[in-house]
Structures are given as C-alpha cells and as structure tokens.
Amino acid sequence: GGHLRSARRGARAGRPARAPLRGPLSLLAAAAWVAMTAAPLAPQGGAERPRARDAGVVVGIFEPGPLNAITDVSGVRVGHATVIEGDSVRTGVTAILPHAGNAFLERVPAAIVVGNGFGKLLGATQVRELGELETPILLTCTLCVWRAADAMVEWLLAQPGMEGVRSVNAVVGETNDGLLNDIRARPVRAEHVVAALESAAEGPVAEGAVGAGAGTVAFGWKGGIGTSSRVLPPHLGGWTVGVLLQSNYGGVLTINGAPVGRELGQYSFRRDLEDTGASADGSIMIVVATDAPIEARALERLAARALTGLARTGSSMSNGSGDYVIAFSTAPAVRRAGPGAAPAGGATLANDALSPLFQAVAEATEEAIYNSLFRATTTRGHRGTVEALPLQPTLDILERHGALHWDRMIPPRRPGAR
C-alpha cells in the first residue's frame, strides 16, 4: 500500500473457523493454528460492536443478501488467519476463494481496476491481460506479499490434478499496516497462509481487526475487514453482488452524506490547516464477487463502479494511496476448465443490463467500508494505539443530519420486487 499515516489511535480481532488442513504445509499450519487461537485475539476495546446497518446506517436502495456479506454470492468462501505476537505484531492474511473447487483448474473471469496505483498487487498484469483468475485472492500486509504468494503457490501445486503445472499467477493484494504492526519483521509465514486458505468457508464473515485487517487504520481510526452484499429484484435479474475489503486509507469520513470526520475533528489535511490530524495517504483493497454471467470486460466496468462507493465515504484516492478493485464472476456459464479450454458457454448479460449491478456494487462497497469501521475496536500495537471510531458521537451526528434509517424513507416496492 501507500504511505503510513499519523493517526489518532481502533480494532476487533477474530478467529478463523477450524477446518482440516491438507498439503505439505499442514503440520506447520496446525502448529500455527494452536499459536493463533491461543493468542489474545479478543477485542481490546470492550464488548463487540454492531455492524453499520444494525446501528441504523442503511445505505442505498437495494436489499442486502441474508448475510450481508460477499459469501451471499453462492460458492464464495472466506478465511482469515490473524497474526498477533507480543506488543508489536498486528497483521494477518485473508483468503477469498471464488468457489469450492480448484481455482486453477476451474477458472473464473476477472478484472482489475486501479484508482491510485501506489501498491503491490501481485499478479495484476496477467489478470488484466487474460481476464481470469487462476488462484484464490489473498490480502495481507505490504512486506508480506511475496511470502504469502510463495506459500499459496506451494499449497496450490500440492493439490490433486496440479502435477504437471509449471506456471501459476498468484494474486495477492496488500495495505501497509506498519503503524500497529512491525512490518519489517514480515511476520506472515507459510502456515498462516495455509490456515487462511484451508479455513475458508461459506457463511458469516468476521470483520474488523481480523486477518489482513488486524493492523489497518482508516480515516485516522481503526479500520479492518468489511463486507456487504446486494441482491437485485427479480425483474432486474435477481443477481447478487458481494464485496469484501481491507480498509487502510485516509480522507474526510462521510457516512450517508453526513460529515462525520469533520465534526469529530479527524480528517485528512487537518495537520496542514491546524497543524494536527490524519494523513490522506493509505490504501484499500476491494474484492467484488457476483453470480451474474458477465465476462472480463463487463467485470472491469463493474469494478470501476466500486470506486464510486469508495468516494462516497470521503476518499479522494491520494498520491500515496493504493486503491485497487478485483472483480470476478462465479457464474458457471463463464467459467473455464483450465488452460486451453473454452468457457462453458451460455448467455451473458448485455451492456444494457449492467446498470443495476453498478448501483449494487457502489452500495455494497460503501457499506462494507462502514462495517470495517463500526466493527473495529481500539488496538494497541507496534508504534502506539489506534482508537476505534466513537460510535455514539458518530450516531449523534448521523441523527442530526438525517442519515439514519433511510430504509424507512423508501416507497413500498412493487409486488414481486425484493
């Protein structure tokens, strides 16, 4: 990711779900599992905090899926490995798997869009050239990218059917968590990567200071992992769009149009105006999944609209920020059964059918960012403490600006609409 920021000093730490370990690194992963689950991963800021929607922050016009998570897209799985060691290591790995099979042998179409490219998104050029994923997506810390990629490639090559493979395009994204994490130690190891990959599951997704979000900072408060989804009404296709992201960036926090960061006195460039405040720099990795049958060109258009959701939260994608979106489709019609194979075949969406998906991804991205902030709790780490977003003052500001419970203002949906 981009530059580190100075910050007012937030986080939630979670534990990945247990899963059987496989492959040559399994014994190492099992040992790491014991170490991670024995570590003090409980929130440091007290009771668990609500998601944004549970607190009355309703974003947009479309309804979320049952989980309001990227895993509402059928088959998508998420796993976390949170790495906390002593007082200085606050980092981890988050793995996003597009389906239950082998990602190399059953490839999904994909696209990458760059808002500001101050980052190290490994594997991006091949995805942009060929328009497909051939590995899971990993998120981690900046100086852990290469170790994470090496571990994922070793894990993938050990899977059945991979005996003759001689080239793998590992996709690994990052943000710089060096305020709370001793990033120069590069603490993410192979066993952490394997634990994230093999614990990946459907169902609810842990948010806040978990996995790759353990040490991140957003808008000067504790950031982390956030997720959200939208389901289109049947007459608009009924497709699902899910977003998962790693928030670690700056700006002037805006929630449903309310100037939260300004009113709380925590915003970018305040140091220039008043000789204090948070930096504009930082990064965000946004992963978008959909079950809509769209190929790489349309996925690129979809990914670009995720950046509009980012902008709504108060980001201006500064010079030192790495702002990336990776989008993929899980639809069987557009998958490809390995090198040399053609897509399975079937109808894909026309351009005219994409606008509802654009609206959905903007809404899900915006809400996922809010979730990353709402779920985070105050975290102590390598170079200080980062405070969580203060919820009651934030909700008071939102109430004052009429930014809560927007769902009550939407006219009733017509019969048959979700």
Feature map (PLM): residue ranges:
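Alpha/propeptide regions of enzymes that mature by internal proteolysis
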Residues: 44-418
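Compositionally biased, low-complexity flexible segments
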Residues: 1-24, 36
